């Protein structure tokens, strides 16, 4: 996932990675490792950080010392995290409605967003009963939701042997069209 995101970002600076529903914050840390700009930072946010997240982070730092001081962990709800237009908001396997909340938070500030959704809730969606892949339809709707908010969206996948929930949504605000003088 991180290599797909880094390729999508291309040569644009990462700036700050904000990993929502981060768990151990490994996605954010790998994105920093893939970024040539050592000034990039990361904020790993989860309402319940794993008890041993500091031990895991210390092990990562021991192997990759250039990450020291660049990753901050925050225990918070998604709606309490300050985001900015220059951020890259990422999330891997944000369950159900959390995927929608991640997209909503990123779009509210015009930040770039990369999301690997999971746990697609279909209980209250009778329109999806006859669909072969209801999760694909939900993710199409998420992509269209971003497009309606002025985003360019790419729907990609990561290898299925990495995760069966492997659809990756990548969105960035469309560049403003220059107006004639």
Which residues does each predicted region cover?
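Class I S-adenosyl-L-methionine
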Residues: 2-181
């Amino acid at each position: 996932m991180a290599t797909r995101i880094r390729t999508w970002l291309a040569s644009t600076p990462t700036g700050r990675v904000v990993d929502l529903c981060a768990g151990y914050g490994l996605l954010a840390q790998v994105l920093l490792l893939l970024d040539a700009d050592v000034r990039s930072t990361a904020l790993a946010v989860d309402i319940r950080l794993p008890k041993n997240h500091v031990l895991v982070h210390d092990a990562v730092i021991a192997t990759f010392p250039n990450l020291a001081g660049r990753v901050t962990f925050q225990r918070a709800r998604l709606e309490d995290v300050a985001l900015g237009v220059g951020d890259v908001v990422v999330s891997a396997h944000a369950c159900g409605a959390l995927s929608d909340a991640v997209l909503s938070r990123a779009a509210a500030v015009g930040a770039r967003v990369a999301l690997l959704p999971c746990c697609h809730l279909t209980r209250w969606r009778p329109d999806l009963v006859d669909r072969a892949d209801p999760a694909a339809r939900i993710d199409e709707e998420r992509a269209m939701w971003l497009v309606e908010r002025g985003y360019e969206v790419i729907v990609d996948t990561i290898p299925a042997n990495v995760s069966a929930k492997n659809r990756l949504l990548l969105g960035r605000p469309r560049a403003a069209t220059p107006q004639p003088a």
